[in-house]
Amino acid sequence: MTARTPNRATGAPENANPTVRDQTQQDQGERSESPAIPSLTNKKRPRSQPDNTSSPACNQCRTRKIRCDRQQPKCSNCRRADVECDFATTPKRVDRTKQLLNDFSGVVARLDRVDNSLAKLSEQLQQQQPCRCSHSPVPSQVDNPWGASEPAAIYTTYTPKSSTSCRSPHLMEVDGSEDCDPEIPNGDLVDFDQGGQRLLDYPAALSLFKNLQRQITRWLTKDVPQGSELWQVIAQQPGFKASLEYQLEQFPFGGLCHEPVIVSDHRPISTPPRYLLELSLDGFLRHINIHTPIFDDSSLGKAIDTHYQSLSAGTGDAWALTFTNIIILTVALDARVARATASHLVSMNDDMLPSFLKNCDRALADLNRFTAPCLINVQVLLTLVRMVINFPEAYIRALVAREFYGSVVFEKVCQAVCQVARSTGLHRAHGARSMRWEKMPERERLFWVVYTMDKQRAFLTGQPCDLYLFDSDIQLRSCGERAPFPLRLNAAYVHMMTIWEQIFINLYSSRAVLAGAADRSRQVQQLWGSLNEWNIKYHALLSSPILEKMADLAPMQLELKYCFMVSQVLVHRCDRNARSQQRYRDPARSALKLIAQVAGDHRSITLARCAVLARMFRNYPLVAVHDLFSFCLTDGEPDSTEDGQLIHETRRHLELLHYADFPQAYFARLEVGLKWCTDMLDTIKDCLSRSAVAGDWGPMDGSSTGLSDRTPPSESELSSIPPDAWASLNLPMSRDEMLCGLSPSVPSEGLLDPQFSAFGLTTSSTGDSTVPAFAQGGDNPAVTMHPSMWVPAEVPCNSSEPLFDPEFTRSIMS
C-alpha cells in the first residue's frame, strides 16, 4: 500500500481529486487577495488587531503578571480573587533590589552627616572656653601646666599669673582672651579604632605619657626652659634637635587606641574540671585572696562541694565563672614565674589560658546576667575585674578583667561591681557593729574590697569614684596587735585607701577647680598630716621583722610601704612650693627602689613576689616614674646614676609581667610607654656625651660634668627639708650600693629596723637617735599634739587654722 504524502503548499494529499484541489487553490487565492485574512502559509496563530480604543490592563493583573480581559468595572481575575480592580493609572513595576539599594544609600549618607557633625562638635568642645561668672577674675595670661619652664608645672596645679586660683593637674583654666594657648588640652580624648572617644584624665598612665610628650614637644618647638643648660645646648645643636625630634616621632600612643572586641560563641558558661580548681585553690588563697579577701577559706570550700555535687541552676553560671577565674589567675601567676625561671611549664600554662578565657568572653558579652543584687554576683564580678587590665585581648571577675582585657572593659566591670554592691546594700551596716577588724562580717569585708578597688580605678583612669565613705555608715575598725599579720596589713591598706579618697576629692577631682591657692595649700597640708598620722599608727607594722615561716608576707609588707610612698608623691606633686617639690623626689626614688627590691633576681622570683610586683604596677599610678623622668628633662640629669638607672630597672622588671600573646594588655602597653621613656633618656645622654667630647657642655674649668654641677643649698633650705626617707627603709642594700648598682652581700633580716625612725618624722640630733624630735620637748610645737606628728617646715605652726580636718581625723583614728 502506497503512503500518501501531503502537499507542502496546501496540506492535501497528492492523489486527491483534481476538482477538490482546484477548489482549494481558488479559496487560497481569494484569501490572499484579502489583506485582513492572513495567509495559511504562516505557521503562527493568527492574531487579531488590537483595539486602540480598549483600556489597558488593570493594576492588579499587571502586578501579578497575568492576562487581563479588561472588563469594566472589574475584570474577571479581580472578580474571582475578590480584590479591588483599578484602571485609574498605569504604575511602573517596582524594582525591589534597586529600591533597597537607594534606601541603604540614603541611610549611609545620613550616617556620614551625623559623623561629620559629631567630629565638628568634638572640635568645638575642645576649643570651647568655659564660662566665667561675672565676679570671677579674668587672668591676663595662661601658663601651660603640661610644659611650663619651671619644675613646678610638671606635677603641680595650674595657676594663672594674675590670679591666685589653683587648679588640679588634670583640669586647666583656659583664658577667655584671644592670646590664650589653644593647645592646652582638657584631659586626653582617646579615639578608638572601633569608633567613639573616651576621656582619660590625670593621672592615668596614658595621660602621664602624653604629658611627657607635650612637654618635650614644647621645649623643642616653642619655649626653652629658663636656666636649663641641657635644652639650651640642644637648641644650639641642630643635630641634637633632629635626634630628639626623631625619637619624639616614635611616641607609641599617637594613633587610635586598639581595644579588643569581645566576641561570644553563644555557648553557656561551662564549669571547669574540679581537679584543676583544687590544684589552683591553694595558690589563689595564699597569693591573691590574702591581699584581696573576696572569699573566706572555709566558705569557699563549702561552695565548691555544693556546686560540684548539685550543679544548681540558680547560681550555677556565677559559681562556674568564679571557679574559672580562680584557675585563670593562678595559672597566669604560675606562667609568669615559669617564664622568669626558665621552667618547662611555660608553654603548658600559656596554652591553657585561651581555653579558659572563652568563659570570660561569654560572661563579658552578656554582663547584665550578673548584675542581680546578690553577694555571689559581687564576688564573681570582683574576680573578673582583676583579669581585664593585664590581658586586654581579655576583683574575681573584676580581677580577671584587669588581667586579660582592656581598660575600657576593666572600668565597665568595676562600675558594674559598684552598682551591684550598692543595690545589695553593702555600704549599709547590718546587725551589731563590732569594733574589731578581725571580727568583721562577710558583707562588710566585701564592701572594703569593692571600696579599695574603686579607689584604684579612680587613679588609674582619672575618673571620679563610684563609692564614697561619707555616703556609707560603715566606718573603719581598729585591728589589734595580736591579730593575724595579713589582717593587720589589710587594715592598714584599707585605711590608706580612705586617705586616697580625700586626695582625689581635694587635689584631683573637678571640685578642686574652684580652690584658690590658699585653699589648695591648706588641703595639701591636711593630707600631709593625715599621711603622717597613718605612718605613726602603722609604724610598728611596717618595721616588724618577718618570721621565716611567714616569708611570703614580706613582699606584702613592702607593697604597703610602696603604697605609702606613692601617696606622698600624689600629695606633694600638687604643691607649688619649691621646697615641697624638692622633698618629694625622695619618696619617688624610694618607690622605684622598692619595686626593684620586690623583683630581685628574676631567676629566683617566687609566686608571692611576682604577685606583689604585679599589684605594684597594676594598682598604683606610675607617678614616680613620670616625675623622675620630668626632673631629668627639667634639670638636665638624664645620665644621673640614680634616676636614669631606676627608670631603666623599672622597665626591666615590668617585662616579667606582660604576655607576648596579648600585645594590647595593660602591662604590655605600659612596657611600651616605659621603653619610649628610656629610649628618650638614652638619646639625650648620647647627645650630651657627644657635646662633652666636643667641649660644648660642662663647666669652664672642666672639673666635673655640667649635669652634677649645682649651687649648694643654703643652711636655711637644708633645715626646712625633712630627713631623707631612705633612712627609714632597711632595704637589703645601702644607698650607695643601690646608686652604684652593687648587689648586697648579706640580706637584712627585717624590712625595717626598729632603730630607724618612722617615715617623715624628724629625729633629735642629740642623744639616742631613735628618739623622735617631738619627744625631746623644747620649742617643738608638735609636743602638744597627741598622737605626735611631723609638721612640714613651710606650714606655720602658730596658724589658727587646723592642720587637717578634725572630723575626718576622728573618723579614721576611731
UniProtKB/Swiss-Prot annotation:
Protein name as catalogued: Transcription factor oryO
Subcellular location: Nucleus
Main location, first listed in the record: nucleus
Residue ranges: DNA binding: 58-85
GO cellular component, one term: nucleus
PANTHER family attached to this UniProt entry: HALOTOLERANCE PROTEIN 9-RELATED, TRANSCRIPTION FACTOR PDR1
A Pfam family per the record: Fungal_trans
Disordered: annotated span: 1-59, 699-723
Gene3D superfamilies: Zn(2)-C6 fungal-type DNA-binding domain
Claim: Nucleus is one of the keywords in the record: yes
Positions with biased composition (Low complexity): 713-723
